[in-house]
Amino acid sequence: MGTHVVSIDSAAAHVTGGTYAWERKLVIQFTPEEMPAIVATLMGITPSARFTNHGADKSKFIEVRRQEGGLVIVTGDKAASYSVPVPTRTAYYVLDLFCRAMAMSQNGPGRSASDILALVRVVHGF
């Protein structure tokens, strides 16, 4: 089984052409311990989740924050930061991705998305 996590790749948008500078992309991987906090934010239990000290030099960060009309995912390091709005209609797929990764991890075999959502609600709920 192994450990399944979610990885985010970010890159600057080119001014023309609607393309991205993937050759200078920033890659950040959520740890298994961080993923429930992201699910709590996606569920609306918490307003945001921010994690720092990622990468070899500990300069990378990622934040998921609820905002009017959906969420925003902000990634960065000491050289750049990228902000990507995620509309409400798309947030469902992000939540599904996190639930599937958590269900597939070695601590989650046999757990359904409902089980994971219930666990997150208990841990992060009010």
For each predicted feature, which ranges?
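Generic structural motif
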Residues: 11-15, 33-35, 67, 89
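Short, structured motif recognition centered on aromatic/hydrophobic residues
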Residues: 6-8, 35-38, 94
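Mixed-charge, glycine-accented linear interaction segment located at domain edges/termini
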Residues: 79-126
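Intrinsic, low-complexity N-terminal interaction/targeting segments
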Residues: 5-8, 49-75
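N-terminal "first-domain core" detector
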Residues: 1-15
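A cross-kingdom feature marking solvent-exposed beta-strand/loop segments within repeated
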Residues: 12-28, 77-84
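Compact, well-ordered interaction domains used in eukaryotic information-processing assemblies
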Residues: 16-19, 25-48
